[in-house]
Structures are given as C-alpha cells and as structure tokens.
Amino acid sequence: MLDRIAPIIFVFLWSTGWVVAKYAAIHSEPFTFLAVRYALSALAFLSLCLAMRAAWPGRAVAFKAVYSGMFLHGFYLGGLWWAIANGVPAGISGIIAALQPLLTAMAAPLLVGERLHGVQRLGLLLGFLGIAIAISPKLFDPATADLAHAAVPLAINLIAMCSVTYGTLYQKKHLQTGNLLPIATLQYVGALIVTVPLMLSFERMHFDGSAQAVAALIWSVFGLSMGGVGLLLYLIRRGQVSRAASLIYLMPPTVALEAFIAFGEPLTLPLILGTIVVVTGVYLTNRPVKVPPQDAKELQRA
C-alpha cells in the first residue's frame, strides 16, 4: 500500500519546497534559514531515533551517511537557494531541476549498474520536453530571458543539480541497509557541515522571526526534511533511482498549481499541455518493464 501512495505524497511534499522558499526568502537569508532547518531536522530525527531505540550504524556507514548528506542536502539546497536569491529566474531554475532525472539515468548504469530500456528513456525525454513546454512563456519573457548578469548563479544552480544527482546515486549504492532514521539524522549533520561555514562566511544570519518565517521553518522541518526527504530515501531504497528521480518532473507543474492557489499566479495553456506530457513521461519511466531472458542472463552475469 505504501509503495503505491508514497510517490504521490512525495510529489506533494517536495513541491511545497518551492512555495516555502518564496516565503522564506522574504524573511531570512538562504544559508541561515537552511542551517536552522537542518539543525532542527537533525534534532527531530534524533528524538525519533531515541524514542524508537533505533540501531545506529557502524563507523563506516555513519561516515557514508554524513558524506551523502553533504550532497543530498548541503550542496544541493544551498546552491539552489543561493542561485535563486542571486538572479536565476524561476523558469530557468525549473528547467535545470528537470535535468536531474536525465543526469541520474545517464549516470546510473556507471555508478549503480541500473539499465534503462527504450520506453524508460523515452519517458525521461518526454519529461524534459514537458517541462520546457510548461515554462516556455517565462523563457521568452524579457523580464526573465536575460541571463548575462546571472552567469555565476546559473553555474551554481547547475552544480547543485549535479550534487543531488550524485547524492542520490551514492545513497542507492552505499546506504541500502540499516535503519533510515539514524541515516537521515547523520545526513543532516553532513548538511550542516556544508551550510554553517557558508552562513558564517557570507551572511549576517538574518532571520526576522515573523509568523510567516516560523511557519515556513516548521513546514520545512516536518513537511519537507522529515516527510519529503524520508519518503525520498524510502523510494530510493525500494526502487530504481532513475524512476524515483523521474518524479522530479512533476514538481514544476505541481508548484504552478500551488502558486495559483497561494499567490493567484495564472495557469497558462503551455503549462497545462506541458503537464500532460510530463505525466506521460513519468508513467513511461515508472511502468514495469519485462526483461527478455537473454538480457536477464546478462544482468545476472554483471
């Protein structure tokens, strides 16, 4: 049952991160907000570990958990939030986010030995095409089309997506066993190792403590860091990483719907058409594929 509903819940929880980021940017600096979020998330997961008497991993696995957290959370969200705060348009950032499943699919055969079949490759390409259609109006908007002033933030945004792709594959290869609660706790320690020095070096640690800022922080900790990330780790462990990553394609259309409800942003025809293409791509990528007997023998030998 959980295997069926987990992707749906994950898409909803993960997509709210974009709305939360919009609220949080008004009330806090990016690294400061993320550092507080990671610290509270680590404490929340630690409390669950103690309450449930979870078995902690050995030193080698603990190090791998901390290391993976540096990429899954620290470099990824730190780079993404900083890039958006420093001039990368949301539409372009959406395209970059949509690149993650393609990066994952290309790297998975090399790093974790997964093989994608033709239909799954088609699904990944359709997902990217759907995202491009959905946000095409923003690409041709003069207010968002000029990226000459945002070369460095754009590069940081690209590096952030490569970071979460690497972190996802590393998680799949090296953290397939053990209790997920201690692993998640240690991953947020890894995120703090990245974020705290950035906060101390580049920010004044501004957080205004308003009701909106606190609400965004609470949701970031319990809805995103615990709910969304917990489900992501579960999906990575239960299925192929490229299939789990393909769910990222559903984020921009879902965020657009949430932005329409929360901020009154219009739902355009390209967005609706793009969403249809995206959903088709995700379906093809996640559809079970029958492996021919000859291919199955080759996989067993590998």
Description of each model-found segment:
Residues 1-35, 43, 144-173, 193, ...:
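Glycine-/small-residue-enriched transmembrane alpha-helix faces in small-molecule transporters
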Residues 1-3, 27-31, 35, 57-63, ...:
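Juxtamembrane helix-entry segments on the extracytoplasmic side of multipass membrane proteins
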Residues 7, 60-69, 116-129, 178-187:
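Cytoplasmic-side transmembrane-helix entry/capping segments in multi-pass membrane proteins
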Residues 13, 17-18, 46-97, 133, ...:
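Specific transmembrane alpha-helical segments of multi-pass solute transporters/efflux pumps
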Residues 26-75, 101-107, 162-167, 184-203, ...:
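Transmembrane alpha-helices of multi-pass small-molecule transport proteins
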Residues 34-36, 77, 92-99, 169-192, ...:
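Helix-helix packing/entry segments at the starts of transmembrane helices
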Residues 45, 119-139, 195, 249-250, ...:
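Hydrophobic transmembrane alpha-helices of multi-pass small-molecule transport proteins
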Residues 47-56, 100-125, 253-273:
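C-terminal transmembrane-helix exit sites in multi-pass transporters
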